[in-house]
């Protein structure tokens, strides 16, 4: 009986811990990100568990706003904006959310998606 209770406790603890893990993407630097926003070619390093199929399956819905080129070797997604406006760049947040990404790290600082947009993509 002791082993069964311990097994359940271990299972539920692991499940809760896994469910609370935030998926985080990152950007090389704020300078590179700002240059990307200006040029309409924004690079984001996605979590390693995302596959090219995952990225492609979500990217197809956002083609009116941007195209996504995904390098599976270094997990870098390059967003090529169709129309480089703040409104179109906001749609990147939908793509990231669809891929279960909740935060983005830039220069060692972690940003929630809305804060990331306000600090980097909106300008």
Enumerate the predicted regions with their spans:
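Bacterial Sec-dependent N-terminal signal peptides
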Residues: 1-25
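Short amphipathic alpha-helix segments
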Residues: 43-64
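Short glycine-/aliphatic-rich beta-strand segments at the starts of folded cytosolic domains
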Residues: 27-48
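Short flexible/disordered coil segments
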Residues: 1-4, 29-34, 101-110
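Surface-exposed, polar helix/loop patches in the mature regions of secreted/periplasmic/lumenal proteins
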Residues: 80-123
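Short, exposed beta-strand/loop patches in secreted or surface proteins that constitute
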Residues: 34-35, 67-70
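Surface-exposed aromatic
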Residues: 70-83
């Amino acid at each position: 009986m002791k082993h069964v209770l311990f097994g359940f406790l271990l299972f539920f603890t692991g499940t809760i811990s896994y469910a609370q893990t935030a998926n985080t993407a990152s950007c090389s630097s704020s300078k590179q990100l700002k240059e990307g926003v200006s040029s309409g070619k924004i690079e984001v390093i996605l979590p390693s568990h995302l596959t090219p199929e995952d990225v492609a399956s979500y990217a197809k819905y956002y083609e009116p706003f941007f195209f996504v080129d995904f390098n599976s070797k270094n997990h870098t997604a390059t967003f090529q904006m169709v129309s480089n406006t703040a409104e179109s760049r906001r749609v990147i947040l939908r793509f990231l959310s669809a891929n279960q990404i909740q935060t983005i790290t830039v220069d060692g600082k972690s940003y929630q998606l809305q804060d990331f947009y306000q600090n980097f993509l909106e300008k």
